[in-house]
Amino acid sequence: MKRLSVVLMAFFLAGAIACYGADGNYADIQQSLVGQKFLDLEEPDVNGVEHKLSDYAGKGKWVLVDFWASWCGPCKAEMPNVTAAYKKYHDKGFEIVGVSFDREKGNWIRAIREWDMPWIHLSDLKYWDNAAREVYGVDAIPDNLLIDPDGIIVARGLRGAALDAVLSEIFK
């Protein structure tokens, strides 16, 4: 009986850790979003013009919401994959909305230009206090969401070859 209690306690603790992850409830938010309609958010572009995610998502195109920042080394390393996907699939109905966790506007704009990212970019320039962090449970970057033409989140965290593999299936 004592052994059964120890085993059950171990399963309980493992489940609790898996659900809450390192940053509180963000793991719960992340997992619960796949299969759900996207949540709208509104942030300014590089010119200060406000845009809503609903201006792009749920409008008949596949949309990748890409969370990144100019100061993020892994984001810079991942960006060639994202750019290649954009160039390969944009004319077939694929759009990207970049959401930056930057706080310095000059660095943000410079990275967009130097990293060859020709899609729409949004940021409230609030670093980790970015509104998207709470809405989408972003606890690390790079991160992304793939939204189908009807506005349903179908995947999260597609990096490297995984992004192209999924998009090549969609657009074959």
Regions found by a protein language model. Give the residues of each.
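N-terminal targeting signals for export/organelle localization
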Residues: 1-40
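Extracytoplasmic and endomembrane cell-envelope/extracellular-matrix remodeling and assembly machinery
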Residues: 44, 48, 104, 163-165
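Loop/turn elements at helix/coil->beta-strand transitions in domains of secreted/extracellular proteins
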Residues: 58-63, 92-94, 116-118, 149
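Structural cue for short, hydrophobic secondary-structure segments
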Residues: 64-68, 98
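Conserved redox-active cysteine motifs that mediate thiol-disulfide chemistry
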Residues: 67-84
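Thiol/disulfide oxidoreductase modules built on the thioredoxin-like
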Residues: 116-117, 124-171
